[in-house]
């Protein structure tokens, strides 16, 4: 039995999709365990670039089972659009499985998300307005509608009527806007459910059977540790748990069945949306990193904020996710910068801080303590081993591994699959 979890160690957008796609080649099953279609990942397969938001990266391998676990919230309309996107490009989706326990995003979740974000004014958290948060709210409040309900005409209508009575009061009384009628939603979304029905099953059984039969299972996280609702920069976070612990509740696979946890990070730091960002760059170097690294959101198109590599953040990710392996991406983006900086600690009110503060007022006041390293000018995009890296690039990579306390297993020097290099096999480690 071998199972590997891929976790983002920063604020998302670390290149998890590419690493998951790369590791998918040696897995029999690929599963997502949290989030929804708020997370975009770009994959290059067969020389073609694909942008996915909900379906696991392993979908391009028709012999591999791809699972959307119970921990996700699924917009049926968005899922069908993504299925069509793949079908139009000749990609089969017969290998997809969707949990019957996954919660469903409905039009009132999208509306609630938009209205709540607008009402916060300057205190907005930067939601993608995909209805993710409100759907998770309903799940916690025990009024959510699950995939199993969506497929049952009577159960779906009954739950929808109950929910709309409550949601419409919210829209009318709090936001002074019209709500929805049952007829507006019911037939359309019940039909979506019927189109998705062929994929829906108990995915916990699928995953545990695979592991019990010694198949390799890859768990694909979305977002990153710093966006985790418990361990991230709350409230500037997502509504689920991207950390490795999210696998257990989000798939129905026990923690003892997880063997390795790969932390994915970029050789610098980026984030979309609001919230403290200690190493953020507002200068020409920041602009260079953004443009060379194409730092624009896959889902929103928003320019990402960028900054120097923050080892405090990645050490935090190592601790809360139990990271066993490091995949360092986008090293090539730093080529040509004369002096590179790595944040080794924070300083606040004269005190050195080695951990990420829970209090965001303190984090906002933190100044990074930097260690400087010389850069390199050589083109490294064709490098295929650590030994081939220029001395300064190799020292930078080694220092990142030392400061984070995570063993380097993979590194990448460009966006293509063949630019991802294996230092050690995470399935056999």
UniProtKB/Swiss-Prot annotation:
<keyword id="KW-0436">Ligase</keyword>
<dbReference type="GO" id="GO:0005525">
    <property type="term" value="F:GTP binding"/>
</dbReference>
<keyword id="KW-0342">GTP-binding</keyword>
<keyword id="KW-0963">Cytoplasm</keyword>
<dbReference type="InterPro" id="IPR042111">
    <property type="entry name" value="Adenylosuccinate_synth_dom3"/>
</dbReference>
<dbReference type="InterPro" id="IPR018220">
    <property type="entry name" value="Adenylosuccin_syn_GTP-bd"/>
</dbReference>
<feature type="binding site">
    <location>
        <begin position="12"/>
        <end position="18"/>
    </location>
    <ligand>
        <name>GTP</name>
    </ligand>
</feature>
<dbReference type="InterPro" id="IPR027417">
    <property type="entry name" value="P-loop_NTPase"/>
</dbReference>
<dbReference type="Pfam" id="PF00709">
    <property type="entry name" value="Adenylsucc_synt"/>
</dbReference>
<dbReference type="InterPro" id="IPR042109">
    <property type="entry name" value="Adenylosuccinate_synth_dom1"/>
</dbReference>
<dbReference type="GO" id="GO:0005737">
    <property type="term" value="C:cytoplasm"/>
</dbReference>
<comment type="pathway">
    <text>Purine metabolism; AMP biosynthesis via de novo pathway; AMP from IMP: step 1/2.</text>
</comment>
<feature type="binding site" description="in other chain">
    <location>
        <begin position="13"/>
        <end position="16"/>
    </location>
    <ligand>
        <name>IMP</name>
    </ligand>
</feature>
<comment type="similarity">
    <text>Belongs to the adenylosuccinate synthetase family.</text>
</comment>
<keyword id="KW-0547">Nucleotide-binding</keyword>
<feature type="binding site">
    <location>
        <begin position="298"/>
        <end position="304"/>
    </location>
    <ligand>
        <name>substrate</name>
    </ligand>
</feature>
<feature type="binding site">
    <location>
        <position position="304"/>
    </location>
    <ligand>
        <name>GTP</name>
    </ligand>
</feature>
<feature type="binding site" description="in other chain">
    <location>
        <position position="223"/>
    </location>
    <ligand>
        <name>IMP</name>
    </ligand>
</feature>
<protein>
    <recommendedName>
        <fullName>Adenylosuccinate synthetase</fullName>
        <ecNumber>6.3.4.4</ecNumber>
    </recommendedName>
</protein>
<feature type="binding site">
    <location>
        <position position="142"/>
    </location>
    <ligand>
        <name>IMP</name>
    </ligand>
</feature>
<dbReference type="GO" id="GO:0046040">
    <property type="term" value="P:IMP metabolic process"/>
</dbReference>
<feature type="active site" description="Proton acceptor">
    <location>
        <position position="13"/>
    </location>
</feature>
<comment type="subunit">
    <text>Homodimer.</text>
</comment>
<feature type="binding site">
    <location>
        <position position="40"/>
    </location>
    <ligand>
        <name>Mg(2+)</name>
    </ligand>
</feature>
<dbReference type="InterPro" id="IPR042110">
    <property type="entry name" value="Adenylosuccinate_synth_dom2"/>
</dbReference>
<feature type="active site" description="Proton donor">
    <location>
        <position position="41"/>
    </location>
</feature>
<feature type="binding site">
    <location>
        <begin position="330"/>
        <end position="332"/>
    </location>
    <ligand>
        <name>GTP</name>
    </ligand>
</feature>
<keyword id="KW-0479">Metal-binding</keyword>
<keyword id="KW-0658">Purine biosynthesis</keyword>
<comment type="function">
    <text>Plays an important role in the de novo pathway of purine nucleotide biosynthesis. Catalyzes the first committed step in the biosynthesis of AMP from IMP.</text>
</comment>
<feature type="binding site">
    <location>
        <position position="13"/>
    </location>
    <ligand>
        <name>Mg(2+)</name>
    </ligand>
</feature>
<feature type="binding site">
    <location>
        <begin position="40"/>
        <end position="42"/>
    </location>
    <ligand>
        <name>GTP</name>
    </ligand>
</feature>
<feature type="binding site">
    <location>
        <begin position="412"/>
        <end position="414"/>
    </location>
    <ligand>
        <name>GTP</name>
    </ligand>
</feature>
<feature type="binding site" description="in other chain">
    <location>
        <position position="128"/>
    </location>
    <ligand>
        <name>IMP</name>
    </ligand>
</feature>
<dbReference type="GO" id="GO:0004019">
    <property type="term" value="F:adenylosuccinate synthase activity"/>
</dbReference>
<keyword id="KW-0460">Magnesium</keyword>
<dbReference type="InterPro" id="IPR033128">
    <property type="entry name" value="Adenylosuccin_syn_Lys_AS"/>
</dbReference>
<feature type="binding site" description="in other chain">
    <location>
        <position position="302"/>
    </location>
    <ligand>
        <name>IMP</name>
    </ligand>
</feature>
<dbReference type="InterPro" id="IPR001114">
    <property type="entry name" value="Adenylosuccinate_synthetase"/>
</dbReference>
<feature type="binding site" description="in other chain">
    <location>
        <begin position="38"/>
        <end position="41"/>
    </location>
    <ligand>
        <name>IMP</name>
    </ligand>
</feature>
<dbReference type="GO" id="GO:0000287">
    <property type="term" value="F:magnesium ion binding"/>
</dbReference>
<dbReference type="GO" id="GO:0044208">
    <property type="term" value="P:'de novo' AMP biosynthetic process"/>
</dbReference>
């Amino acid at each position: 039995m071998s199972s590997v979890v891929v976790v983002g160690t920063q604020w998302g957008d670390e290149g998890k999709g590419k690493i998951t796609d790369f590791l998918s080649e040696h897995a029999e099953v690929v599963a997502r365990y949290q989030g929804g279609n708020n997370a975009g990942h770009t994959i290059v397969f067969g020389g073609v670039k694909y942008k996915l938001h909900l379906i696991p990266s392993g979908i391009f391998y028709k012999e591999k089972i791809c699972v959307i676990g119970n921990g996700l919230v699924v917009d049926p309309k968005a899922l069908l659009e993504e299925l069509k996107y793949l079908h139009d490009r000749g990609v089969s989706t017969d290998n997809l499985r969707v949990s019957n326990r996954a919660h469903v995003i409905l039009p009132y979740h999208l509306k609630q998300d938009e209205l709540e974000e607008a009402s916060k004014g300057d205190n907005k958290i930067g939601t993608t307005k995909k209805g993710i948060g409100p759907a998770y709210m309903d799940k916690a409040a025990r009024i959510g509608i699950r995939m199993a309900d969506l497929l049952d005409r009577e159960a779906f209508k009954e739950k929808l009527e109950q929910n709309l009575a409550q949601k419409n009061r919210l829209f009318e009384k709090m936001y002074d806007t019209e709500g929805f009628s049952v007829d507006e939603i019911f037939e359309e979304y019940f039909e979506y459910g019927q189109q998705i029905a062929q994929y829906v099953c108990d995915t916990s059984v699928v995953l545990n059977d695979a592991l019990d039969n010694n198949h390799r299972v890859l768990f694909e996280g979305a977002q990153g540790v710093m966006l985790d609702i418990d361990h991230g920069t709350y409230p500037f976070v997502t509504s689920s748990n991207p950390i490795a612990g999210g696998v257990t509740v989000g798939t129905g696979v026990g923690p003892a069945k997880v063997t390795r946890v790969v932390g994915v990070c970029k050789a610098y730091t980026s984030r979309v949306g609001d919230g403290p960002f200690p190493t953020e760059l507002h200068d020409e170097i920041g602009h260079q990193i953004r443009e060379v690294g194409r730092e624009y959101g896959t889902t929103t198109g928003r320019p990402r904020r960028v900054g120097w590599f923050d080892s405090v953040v990645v050490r935090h990710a190592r601790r809360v996710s139990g990271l066993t392996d490091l995949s360092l991406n986008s090293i090539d983006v730093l080529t040509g910068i004369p002096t590179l900086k790595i944040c080794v600690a924070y300083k606040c009110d004269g005190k050195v801080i080695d951990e990420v503060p829970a209090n965001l007022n303190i984090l906002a006041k933190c100044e990074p303590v930097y260690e400087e390293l010389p850069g390199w000018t050589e083109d490294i995009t064709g490098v295929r081993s650590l030994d081939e890296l220029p001395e300064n690039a190799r020292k930078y990579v080694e220092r990142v591994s030392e400061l984070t306390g995570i063993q380097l297993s993979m590194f990448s020097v460009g966006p293509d699959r063949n630019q991802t290099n294996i230092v050690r096999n995470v399935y056999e480690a």
